[in-house]
């Protein structure tokens, strides 16, 4: 079992550090090199791999400096996106061996067209596709693509730990409660999130099991969720409900 640590960056990013038992590690989506280098030095760790989910600068901005500090590091990322530092270009179905664990690459377009995720060891690193109680904005893809990406994630085991790249949970929960004000799981989660954030403790990782109970973007077949967007849709199929939710969240 790999050990995962969060390295905060910018206002609300999480850079995930994946560590094995002999001081070797990888990082996921290092938008800023400085906090990573400080953590590596303080803990006497050697960086062996960088995993990238998509090309936005708050996810890749620190890669060049990390490569300079660790010239032999592998840089793994999406084949379909313009990331010049890649040494290993990956796409749906590819496999990655990381400290004795096999990670599968998932194609997760929507937020960006080439966005990928990494799933293995009971963990999903999903960048900006799925957040706790929310999902990413659709910048390059279509609502249909994002819906399919989330549907793909939904098929993973429910105990899968979800490591997304931002601490957006409190604002996401506020929206989720506007969608489902009577959801008791959400009300309890709001209290849990407020307590954790009051102590400056991350709300991430979450689990897929929890998200299926509280995340409106994964609940497009739920009657209360459908009812909440009735005045925004002509058809109540799950993708139309999801699309209406995403448009509502954009203006929330």
Curated annotation (Swiss-Prot):
One of its GO terms (molecular function) is metal ion binding. Zn(2+) 1 binds at residues 54, 56, 111, 128. Zn(2+) 2 binds at residues 58-59, 128, 166. Pathway: Secondary metabolite metabolism; methylglyoxal degradation; (R)-lactate from methylglyoxal: step 2/2. Binds 2 Zn(2+) ions per subunit. CDD domains: hydroxyacylglutathione_hydrolase_MBL-fold (cd07723). The keyword Zinc applies. Its EC number is 3.1.2.6. Keywords: Hydrolase, Metal-binding, Zinc. SMART domains: Lactamase_B. InterPro entries: Clx_II_MBL, Glyoxalase_II_hydrolase, HAGH_C, Hydroxyacylglutathione_Hdrlase, Metallo-B-lactamas, RibonucZ/Hydroxyglut_hydro. One of its GO terms (biological process) is methylglyoxal catabolic process to D-lactate via S-lactoyl-glutathione. Belongs to the metallo-beta-lactamase superfamily. Glyoxalase II family. Thiolesterase that catalyzes the hydrolysis of S-D-lactoyl-glutathione to form glutathione and D-lactic acid. PANTHER family: HYDROXYACYLGLUTATHIONE HYDROLASE, HYDROXYACYLGLUTATHIONE HYDROLASE GLOB. Monomer. This is Hydroxyacylglutathione hydrolase. It comes from Vibrio campbellii (strain ATCC BAA-1116). The lineage of its organism: Bacteria, Pseudomonadati, Pseudomonadota, Gammaproteobacteria, Vibrionales.
């Amino acid at each position: 079992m790999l050990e995962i640590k969060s390295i905060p960056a910018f206002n609300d990013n999480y850079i995930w550090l994946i560590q094995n038992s002999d001081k070797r590690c990888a990082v996921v989506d290092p938008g800023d090199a400085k906090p990573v280098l400080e953590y590596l030095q303080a803990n006497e760790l050697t960086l062996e791999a960088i995993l990238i989910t998509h090309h936005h600068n708050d996810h890749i901005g620190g890669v060049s400096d990390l490569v300079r500090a660790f010239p032999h590091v592998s840089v793994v990322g999406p084949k379909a996106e313009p990331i010049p530092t890649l040494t290993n270009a990956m796409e749906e179905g590819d496999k990655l061996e990381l400290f004795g664990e096999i990670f599968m690459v998932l194609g997760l377009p929507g937020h960006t067209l080439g966005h990928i995720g990494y799933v293995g060891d009971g963990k999903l690193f999903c960048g900006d596709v799925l957040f706790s109680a929310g999902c990413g904005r659709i910048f390059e893809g279509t609502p249909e693509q994002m819906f399919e990406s989330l549907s793909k994630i939904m098929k993973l085991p429910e105990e899968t730990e979800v490591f997304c790249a931002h601490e957006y949970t409190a604002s996401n929960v506020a929206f989720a409660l506007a969608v489902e004000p009577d959801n008791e799981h959400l009300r309890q989660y709001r209290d849990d999130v407020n307590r954790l954030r009051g102590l400056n403790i991350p709300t991430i990782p979450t689990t897929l099991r929890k998200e299926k109970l509280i995340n409106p973007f994964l609940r497009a077949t739920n009657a209360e969720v459908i009812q909440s967007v009735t005045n925004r849709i002509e058809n109540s199929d799950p993708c139309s409900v999801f699309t209406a939710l995403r448009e509502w969240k954009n203006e929330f």
